[in-house]
């Protein structure tokens, strides 16, 4: 037996040192992307000052990054079925490298924005990593490895954002992109060395660019509709224009997929109980639970009259850091557990616990020990159980003929769901009353209940993992 054979299972999947090396390489790839999201936020005021623009203008540094993240998540993930996961990871790293160079040497905001757009395309690193793990590892190893990768989604427990602030204060915002380039270079050699050489493209046809562009327009314009409606006005002409463009994009996508020889995702697959319930589950889970942790409780806790009167830093320490840290610890364990208990069953457990915790918060919003305890429960139930299994199910339930289709579409729903939830509850959660917080919580509970209902409708394909 060769050394290489010793690191392969009986069914040809990776194990041992080769598996560890692959997971490490993929972790570096997703960290390279994630640092662009988490480290840059503290540097926005410094960027505005150095480039001579307003803080409002420099907010495009984040919004454009997220916009192109939606585009990359859909197109690049599905395109990897045709050109290979390895090639698309190299393309992602190339975009990160060039985008970071442009950011380092930018002398004006437009040049920096071009760099940020290129960096945003790399959001597909998460979905492609999940697909690679599913194809290279056995079912049980896949779950554990996916949990490890999922734990990095959203940052490294807040440490990366803190380091970003320190680097900006000491060396300026350009130092952040130098750090990112270092990670990109290490990631490149990691993928070069650890990626399985025998992994071939999953699809042999021709990518449906027309369908891909249509669904991307629909998703992006829907996201802009939600953002513009909540920040400007739901009746503003631009908001209405985004809604019309989103509807047109989805209609054109539907019509295109009906006649496409090799669709992005077929209409029959969309109608199946292994696809639409997951898309709905992702959308409603994020819309229901994300705003509770990241907005409702944070805003209420800083209200000195009816809330807990906390400072911004204390509020973060009580309500943002615990669920993030708990999620990082819980995600790998959930990934290990889900293949044994069942991916869909694990998701249902997580959503049920989310609903229980949210109902308790709604009933006792002014009881600090109770609310903090429920936030800890949400750290396990939402950050750990729900997010890990939703990411895993995107791969596990994806149709065999188009493995990248469901991760691409469901991945886009993560951002849409969180934006939708924030838009729906923010008018109530921010009105400075206990009744407003309770109303926001009731809305969140109803949406999360819809996510649980969607999980009850989920079914794996015959003979597949569930």
Language-model regions, residue ranges each:
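Helix-to-loop junctions at the C-terminal end of transmembrane segments
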Residues: 72-85, 168, 329-343
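Paired small-residue
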Residues: 95, 99-102, 110-118, 369-378
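12-transmembrane solute porter fold
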Residues: 19-32, 40-41, 55, 237, ...
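Cytoplasmic helix-loop-helix junction between adjacent transmembrane helices
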Residues: 117-151
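Extracellular/periplasmic helix-loop-helix junction of adjacent transmembrane segments
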Residues: 41-71, 109, 313-314
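Helix-breaking motifs and short loop linkers at transmembrane-helix boundaries and internal kinks
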Residues: 50-52, 84, 104-111, 138, ...
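Conserved MFS/SLC helix-loop-helix module at the cytosolic interface between two early adjacent transmembrane helices
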Residues: 70-108
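Hydrophobic transmembrane-helix bundles of small-molecule transporters
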Residues: 169-281, 288
């Amino acid at each position: 037996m060769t050394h290489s054979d010793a690191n392969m299972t009986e069914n040809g999947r990776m194990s041992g040192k080769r598996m560890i090396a692959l997971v490490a390489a993929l972790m570096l790839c997703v960290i390279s992307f994630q640092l662009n999201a988490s480290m840059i936020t503290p540097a926005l005021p410094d960027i505005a000052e150095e480039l001579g623009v307003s803080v409002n203008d420099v907010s495009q540094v984040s919004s454009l990054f997220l916009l192109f993240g939606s585009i990359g998540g859909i197109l690049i993930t599905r395109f990897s079925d045709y050109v290979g996961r390895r090639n698309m990871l190299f393309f992602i790293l190339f975009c990160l490298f060039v985008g970071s160079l442009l950011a380092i040497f930018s002398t004006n905001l437009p040049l920096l924005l071009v760099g940020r757009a290129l960096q945003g395309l790399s959001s597909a690193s998460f979905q492609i990593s999940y697909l690679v793990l599913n194809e290279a590892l056995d079912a049980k190893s896949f779950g554990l490895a996916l949990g490890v990768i999922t734990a990095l989604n959203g940052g490294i427990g807040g440490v990366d954002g803190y380091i970003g602030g320190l680097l900006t204060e000491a060396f300026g915002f350009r130092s952040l992109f130098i750090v990112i380039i270092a990670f990109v270079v290490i990631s490149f050699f990691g993928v070069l060395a650890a990626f399985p050489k025998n992994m071939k493209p999953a699809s042999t046809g021709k990518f449906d660019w027309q369908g891909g562009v249509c669904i991307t327009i629909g998703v992006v314009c829907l996201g802009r509709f939600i953002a513009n409606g909540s920040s400007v006005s739901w009746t503003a002409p631009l908001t209405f224009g985004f809604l019309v463009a989103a509807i047109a994009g989805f209609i054109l996508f539907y019509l295109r997929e009906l006649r496409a020889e090799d669709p992005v995702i077929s209409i029959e697959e969309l109608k199946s109980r292994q696809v639409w319930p997951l898309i709905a589950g992702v959308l409603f889970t994020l819309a229901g639970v994300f705003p509770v942790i990241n907005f409702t409780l944070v805003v209420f806790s800083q209200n000195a009259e009816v809330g807990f009167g906390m400072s911004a830093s204390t509020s973060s320490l009580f309500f943002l850091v615990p669920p993030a840290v708990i999620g990082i610890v819980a995600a790998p364990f959930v990934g290990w557990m889900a293949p044994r208990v069942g991916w869909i069953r694990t998701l249902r457990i997580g959503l049920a616990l989310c609903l229980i915790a949210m109902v308790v918060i709604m009933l006792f919003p002014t009881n600090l020990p109770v609310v903090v305890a429920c936030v800890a429960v949400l750290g396990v139930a939402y950050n750990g159980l729900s997010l890990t299994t939703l990411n895993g199910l995107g791969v596990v339930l994806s149709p065999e003929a188009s493995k990248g289709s469901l991760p691409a579409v469901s991945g886009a729903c993560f951002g849409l769901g969180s934006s939708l939830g924030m838009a729906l509850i923010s008018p109530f959660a921010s009105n400075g009353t206990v009744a407003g917080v309770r109303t926001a919580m009731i809305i969140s509970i109803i949406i999360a209940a819809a996510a649980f209902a969607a999980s009850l409708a989920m079914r794996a394909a015959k003979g597949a993992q569930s």
